[in-house]
Amino acid sequence: MNKKPLEQIKNVTNVTGYRQVSLWKREDLQHPQPDELAEEVPVALVYNGISHVVMMASPKDLEQFAVGFSLSEGIIEHRREIFGMDVVAVCNGLEVQIELSSRRFMGLKARRRALAGRTGCGVCGVEQLNDIGKPVQPLPFTQSFDLANLDQALAHLNDFQPVGRLTGCTHAAAWVRLTGELAGGFEDVGRHVALDKLLGRRAEVGEGWQHGAALVSSRASYEMVQKAAMCGVEILFAVSAATTLAVEVAERCNLTLVGFCKPGRATVYTHPQRLIAG
């Protein structure tokens, strides 16, 4: 592939995730005004020289995305199975070049599939309907979360959306400690990608983020539930609703799924035994 850098992303280590543009407002179509738009670029994950998937994503925090995607898709089981990564600008987007352990790469080749990405859509390109669901080990019940602490987390979720505050165009995913404090978070134009970035960072942090919950600014799709469960996350909070398939998957894998998370409000779909009313 031609390794010419993108005009918009010449330095892949120092990107903002947005671009200055000129546009027109309804009340004045004669005079353009400055504004910001969120960047959306094709990102290819390349394992040991073989391109596996292309996703549309924000061009930030791509190492965390690669780790999280690799874990949540079952390509690896541990962060240490990735030996190295490089982010490279190519003619049509970005590549994350990932060096996998030999054992994991052999497993990937055995079940390799080609996905052509929409915005963070992980179903696009799946060859058969039976390939959509992944086997997930039922989660243990090792923690409880006091819902009285959820409002604190919700109040600070926007802290991890600097591009979203400028553009109104990103989703967020954050890690909530059992105290309600947000330990960290990520944003992306794709909700699944934002969650993958969070899961990747959680794997890098290790024990410090073992207990707690994931909080996403979007709806809860089946795939987000599956990704969380694949990474051992026991509780998933979503600002919007859950789908029927998301609830079915959460029930089956013992994940506590909570939607419509707003100040003073939460709707629990599955496994309320991990929660304390508040």
Curated annotation (Swiss-Prot):
Its main location: cytoplasm. It is found in: Cytoplasm. One of its GO terms (molecular function) is sulfur carrier activity. Keywords: Cytoplasm, Molybdenum cofactor biosynthesis. The keyword Cytoplasm applies. Gene3D superfamilies: 3.10.20.10, Cytidine Deaminase, domain 2. The active site is at C121. GO terms for cellular component: cytoplasm. GO terms for biological process: Mo-molybdopterin cofactor biosynthetic process. The keyword Cytoplasm applies. Mo-bis(molybdopterin guanine dinucleotide) binds at F260, C261, K262, P263, G264, R265. Belongs to the FdhD family. Required for formate dehydrogenase (FDH) activity. Acts as a sulfur carrier protein that transfers sulfur from IscS to the molybdenum cofactor prior to its insertion into FDH. PANTHER family: FORMATE DEHYDROGENASE, SULFUR CARRIER PROTEIN FDHD. This is Sulfur carrier protein FdhD. It comes from Klebsiella pneumoniae subsp. pneumoniae (strain ATCC 700721 / MGH 78578). The gene is fdhD.
